[in-house]
């Protein structure tokens, strides 16, 4: 039977006859009633919309705009960080801002609840990336890469309570450096700590300390203290809060909320208060409980070797073996570390800024294998720089000192004291641009000279080239120093070379 659309011919004929039939009185009344109801609803909605208070324009909670002033400071920080990564031979890369939700789940322990999920898109469940490490591991497994040294700068998203006054956001930038591949023990790990020291020293944020531990030592400590293996990750997450909470509060969480026996928590407390240098590593080798745990001994052996390399790098004095460091993320398997500022540069009488850790990282040898169909592992170690917190510290320091920054890099301004000289200015600025010189001009046919000079002073442009009737007649260009207000006349054909000379000397 032939079809019209999806209905047989007879069905279409029946439907059309009903639609074309004149309406009865009851139907007409019902239609009129429905029309009145719809009109009333629409009127109510419009009225409610009109009575609605003015819309408040703002950024979403936990996010912020970056002004040109902020971007100048941020770019300087990122340039320093990236140049350090490149100095150590890293290659740049990027991954999508969102991943399949399955890629990210079960990688972050209790923090998995902080991921931002996206609405279903064509049958795929997606989440915004929580960090840059898991996407990197997925990339290695997907492309069967066995060895790589990479850096990655990008935004990540976490649905946590933001503390913007301390540089904590829901959307923030991370700068990661990672070494993937099978190498001799602790050599890549030592380089990561060296990079961390170079960056924090270069940023001149003040004195800092890098805490180190090993997840095998943490797990061994839990085992000898009597923590059930099923509670290892949950208790690890509690220990990770010791940088923000007092021991009594962490103990309360472990005992009351996570069901740990009080005597077990007390045994853990004896360990997590220990911190020191390589001598503490030696001391833990002799510990009557830890020395009986194979995992802990492996971790202590690697830390001893690590301190040997750190001494050769000249940074051992910046490193502290700290048994309270746990790093709550599930994917860490070996050495872990975290950098904290001991004091930030502040004026006398001011409280030091407390922003928590400014860099962290560790070894994650099993993460790539989670994505490989055959479970092939690619050992990895890396670090992440907390750009937002560092930026907050630098920003506060500049505010305290009253420092200002230039928002442009313009070197030369093209000006005129007379009307109808737009074409000449366009010729001059084109020559400057073509010579690689950063130049600007006002987008007006007849700008006032005073306005042009004031613009240079307010934006920090060092040089002005001036073209007018007299200069055009004599075949010269005036070059003016904004700082000294001195002017010299240079032949038209030599003015670019003269500017390049002055810029190279400044």
Curated annotation (Swiss-Prot):
Q: Note the effect listed for residue 200 to V.
A: In PRLTS2; the mutant protein is expressed, can dimerize and localizes to the mitochondria; has significantly decreased enzymatic activity compared to wild-type
Report the Pfam families cross-referenced here. Answer: HGTP_anticodon, tRNA-synt_His
Q: What family is reported?
A: Belongs to the class-II aminoacyl-tRNA synthetase family.
User: What is the protein name stated in its UniProt record?
Assistant: Histidine--tRNA ligase, mitochondrial
Asked if the record carries the keyword Protein biosynthesis, the reply is yes
**Native source species:** Homo sapiens (Human)
Give the catalysed reaction(s), semicolon-separated.
Answer: tRNA(His) + L-histidine + ATP = L-histidyl-tRNA(His) + AMP + diphosphate + H(+)
Tissue specificity note: A high level expression is seen in the heart, kidney and skeletal muscle while a lower level expression is seen in the brain and liver.
Q: Which residues form a coiled coil?
A: none
Where is it localised? Mitochondrion
N6-acetyllysine found at: 444
In its UniProt record, a GO molecular function of this protein is: ATP binding
Major localization class: mitochondrion
- Which of UniProt's keywords are assigned here? Acetylation, Aminoacyl-tRNA synthetase, ATP-binding, Deafness, Disease variant, Ligase, Mitochondrion, Nucleotide-binding, Phosphoprotein, Protein biosynthesis, Transit peptide
Q: Name one GO biological process term.
A: histidyl-tRNA aminoacylation
InterPro entries linked:
aa-tRNA-synth_II, aa-tRNA-synth_II/BPL/LPL, Anticodon-bd, Anticodon-bd_dom_sf, His-tRNA-ligase, HisRS-like_core, HisRS/HisZ, HisRS_anticodon
Keyword hit for Transferase: no
Q: Which GO terms describe its cellular component?
A: cytosol; mitochondrial matrix; mitochondrion
């Amino acid at each position: 039977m032939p079809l019209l659309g999806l209905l047989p011919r007879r069905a279409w004929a029946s439907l059309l006859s009903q639609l074309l039939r004149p309406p009865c009185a009851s139907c007409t009344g019902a239609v009129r009633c429905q029309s009145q109801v719809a009109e009333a609803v629409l009127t109510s909605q419009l009225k409610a919309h009109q009575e609605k208070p003015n819309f408040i324009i703002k950024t979403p909670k936990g996010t912020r705009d970056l002004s040109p002033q902020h971007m100048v400071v941020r770019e300087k920080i990122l340039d320093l960080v990236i140049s350090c990564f490149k100095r150590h031979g890293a290659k740049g890369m990027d991954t999508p801002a969102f991943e399949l939700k399955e890629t990210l789940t079960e990688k972050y322990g209790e923090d998995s609840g902080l991921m931002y999920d996206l609405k279903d898109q064509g049958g795929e469940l997606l989440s915004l990336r929580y960090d840059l490490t898991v996407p990197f591991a997925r990339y290695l497994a997907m492309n069967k890469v066995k060895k790589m040294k990479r850096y990655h700068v990008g935004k990540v998203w976490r649905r946590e309570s933001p503390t913007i006054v301390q540089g904590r956001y829901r959307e923030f930038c991370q700068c990661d450096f990672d070494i993937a591949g099978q190498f001799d023990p602790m050599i890549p790990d030592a380089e990561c700590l060296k990079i961390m020291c170079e960056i924090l020293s270069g940023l001149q944020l003040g004195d800092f300390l890098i805490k180190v531990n090993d997840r095998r030592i943490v797990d061994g400590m839990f085992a000898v203290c009597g923590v059930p293996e099923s509670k290892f990750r949950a208790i690890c997450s509690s220990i990770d809060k010791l940088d923000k909470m007092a021991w009594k509060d962490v103990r309360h969480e472990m005992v009351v909320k996570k069901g740990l026996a009080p005597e077990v928590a007390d045994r853990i407390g004896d360990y997590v208060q220990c911190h020191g240098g390589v001598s503490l590593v030696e001391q833990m080798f002799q510990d009557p409980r830890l020395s009986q745990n194979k995992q802990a001994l492996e971790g202590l052996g690697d830390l001893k070797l690590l301190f040997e390399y750190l001494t050769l790098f000249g940074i051992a004095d910046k490193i502290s073996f700290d048994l309270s460091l746990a790093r709550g993320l599930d994917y860490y398997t070996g050495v872990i570390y975290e950098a904290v500022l001991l004091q930030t540069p502040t004026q006398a009488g001011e409280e030091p800024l407390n922003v928590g850790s400014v860099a962290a990282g560790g070894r994650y040898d099993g993460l790539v294998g989670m994505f490989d169909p055959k479970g092939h592992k690619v050992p990895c170690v890396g670090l992440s720089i907390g750009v937002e917190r560092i930026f907050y510290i630098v920003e506060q320091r500049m505010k305290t000192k009253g420092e200002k920054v230039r928002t442009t890099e313009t070197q030369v301004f093209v000006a005129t004291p007379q009307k109808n000289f737009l074409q000449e200015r366009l010729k001059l600025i084109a020559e400057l641009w073509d010579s690689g010189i950063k130049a600007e001009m006002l987008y007006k046919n007849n700008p006032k000279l005073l306005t042009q000079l004031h613009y240079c002073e307010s934006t920090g442009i060092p040089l002005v080239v001036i073209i007018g009737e007299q200069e055009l007649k004599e075949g010269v260009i005036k070059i003016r120093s904004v700082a000294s207000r001195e002017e010299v006349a240079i032949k038209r054909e030599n003015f670019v070379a003269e500017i390049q000379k002055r810029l190279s000397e400044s």
